[in-house]
């Protein structure tokens, strides 16, 4: 009987250690106070550098920040050098990594696919890179934003 109890205790202890290790390895280092720096309305301007060049402009709204998790919506128009123009909009979700670094993914409809963004937030400015991870031909390029007052 004590052998079964010892095995159960050992199994519970291993699960607790594994969960603690996983949580500590995956948790961003941002404090909850600094996480709110990304919340709000932003302009969004990007360049598509591959496979077809183009420009992307519109808005990014970060509407919910729960310590390190963020959510919002992106609404943009992409204009390619081929003359094709398309409006894309969809939900945004991501993580505040530290006091100035954010990572978020925009799930854009109308063939925009999923676009991963990595950016620095400095005051009322946002700048970084994006890459298309699903959807049409893979695209990538720089982007920036300004907080709207």
Language-model features: locations:
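Edge beta-strand at a domain terminus
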Residues: 31, 59-60, 85-100, 123-149
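An anionic, turn-rich surface loop/hairpin at beta-sheet edges
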Residues: 88, 92, 100-118
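Bacterial Sec-dependent N-terminal signal peptides
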Residues: 19-41, 149
